[in-house]
């Protein structure tokens, strides 16, 4: 939680409509889903255990840089395939409780490789957690392998190669995250071309901490979805491009406010994007670290920005339509949305 008051804490409980609305989530980091109690529990397996209070303290930060340090501190506690199995399974249980039918989840593969972990073994743990979660909770989940900008293009290529290795085992795409201010999208062109040539889908975090030029760069990488796109509104030509091409934008309201990327609730462009015809989706980003949930993000949109139930249903539909699911599965889930569950 940031040192400012948690934005979602002031919201009323999500409505019955929101709780019952079938949803998809497209911008969700596995490692950002670890609740403090679980992080403390995992740390007990090793020689540097955390108390719950110490774990909670890791999730306090004043801005985006502080958030990245908190994320790093949390991920350093993950060491074994069993750790990843635990958090994958528990994430799927949480998704089911929020009526999320499908999620596409970022895994920080770049960090695993940077730390010289045995990622092949870690992936087996991830798949065990996913398979158990799907069996018990009925949630559909696909993996997106995430590279870290500040590690550079060679490390990003290693992430993409791992995605290609596992692309027939529920790995659907690749993305690039981290600090946009340190490495522009153009550095990763070869990695994105390699991924596309091998049938992987493409996403990119862009316009979160920098301006519209980063979003243009992501589009030039042939990114099919844009994570955050917080500053697209500053460029009318870019807005027109997003609308004309119906490029899905992964909006993360609480995240943008808690990292201070958006200084005031009123300044967030969600409503502006929706009214202009941008294909927006709602997402949590790092729900445990921002003390939010997808139901609360929908409640945020309704209570702060005045979205009607019908408009929230349209946003939920965008989530399924913008997913990287195969056409048949996508139609199945859209039919469940239309049927109400």
Q: What residues fall within each predicted segment?
A:
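Metal-cofactor-binding active-site regions of metalloenzymes
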Residues: 2-200, 209-214, 220, 224-225, ...
């Amino acid at each position: 939680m940031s040192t400012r008051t948690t934005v979602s804490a002031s919201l009323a409980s999500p409505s019955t409509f929101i709780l019952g609305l079938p949803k998809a989530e497209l911008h969700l980091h596995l490692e950002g889903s670890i609740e403090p109690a679980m992080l403390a529990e995992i740390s007990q397996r090793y020689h540097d255990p955390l108390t719950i209070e110490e774990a909670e303290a890791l999730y306090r930060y004043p801005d985006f840089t502080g958030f990245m340090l908190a994320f790093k501190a949390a991920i350093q506690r993950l060491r074994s395939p069993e750790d990843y199995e635990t958090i994958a399974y528990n994430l799927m249980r949480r998704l089911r409780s929020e009526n999320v039918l499908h999620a596409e989840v970022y895994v920080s593969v770049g960090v695993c490789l940077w730390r010289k972990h045995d990622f092949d073994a870690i992936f087996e743990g991830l798949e065990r957690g996913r398979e158990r979660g799907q069996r018990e909770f009925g949630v559909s989940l696909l993996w997106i392998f995430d590279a870290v900008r500040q590690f550079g293009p060679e490390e990003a290529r290693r992430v993409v190669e791992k995605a290609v290795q596992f692309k027939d085992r529920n790995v659907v795409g690749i993305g690039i995250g981290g600090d946009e201010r340190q490495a522009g999208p153009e550095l990763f062109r070869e990695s994105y071309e390699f991924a596309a040539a091998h049938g992987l889908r493409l996403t990119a975090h862009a316009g979160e901490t920098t301006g519209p030029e980063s979003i243009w760069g992501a589009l030039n990488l042939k990114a099919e979805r844009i994570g955050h796109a917080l500053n697209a509104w500053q460029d009318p030509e870019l807005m027109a491009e997003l609308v004309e091409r119906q490029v899905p934008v992964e909006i993360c309201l609480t995240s943008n406010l808690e990292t201070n990327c958006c200084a005031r609730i009123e300044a967030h462009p969600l409503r502006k994007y929706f009214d202009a015809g941008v294909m927006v989706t709602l997402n949590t980003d790092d729900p445990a670290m921002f003390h939010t949930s997808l139901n609360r993000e929908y409640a945020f949109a309704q209570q702060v920005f005045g979205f009607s139930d019908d408009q929230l249903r349209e946003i939920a539909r965008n989530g399924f339509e913008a997913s990287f699911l195969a056409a048949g599965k996508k139609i199945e889930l859209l039919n469940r949305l239309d049927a109400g569950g």
